[in-house]
Amino acid sequence: MNLIQQLEKEQFDKLSANKTIPEFGPGDTVIVNVKVVEGERTRVQAYEGVCIGRSGGGINESFTVRKISYGEGVERVFPILSPMIDSIKVVRRGKVRRAKLYYLRQLRGKSARIVEKQDRQQAAAVNE
């Protein structure tokens, strides 16, 4: 392991020590609680949408969340280890076959829906 990788690993371990980052990927609906500074006050704002992709790795990893706000599509890119992110919560898991869901930008209404992924144990428990 070279010096740069070693330094990045140390920084990643230090930054992620006090954060819990859930496992999520493209197609998952997530709620990202973002710290917003207004003057001298700081408040937490929830940003809920579909993760349309993750990029980078280690300390440089980021993810893009897309939501529809008042009929207009809004995308926001969040660095995973950003100090402005208070928490990340996975609401539902989506069943997709792509790593980047950029095709959702052209879709409207029902065609833009993502099918929810079913857990095998959960489905077996429901059928019994």
From Swiss-Prot:
Residues in coiled coil: none
Stated name of the protein: Large ribosomal subunit protein bL19
Family, as annotated: Belongs to the bacterial ribosomal protein bL19 family.
Pfam families in UniProt: Ribosomal_L19
PANTHER family: LARGE RIBOSOMAL SUBUNIT PROTEIN BL19M (PTHR15680:SF9), RIBOSOMAL PROTEIN L19 (PTHR15680)
Taxonomic source organism: Bradyrhizobium sp. (strain ORS 278)
GO CC annotation: cytosolic large ribosomal subunit
Keyword terms, alphabetized: Ribonucleoprotein, Ribosomal protein
Example GO biological process: translation
Gene responsible for this protein: rplS
Keyword DNA-binding (UniProt): no
Function (record text): This protein is located at the 30S-50S ribosomal subunit interface and may play a role in the structure and function of the aminoacyl-tRNA binding site.
Gene Ontology MF: a single term: structural constituent of ribosome
NCBIfam families named among the record's database cross-references: rplS_bact
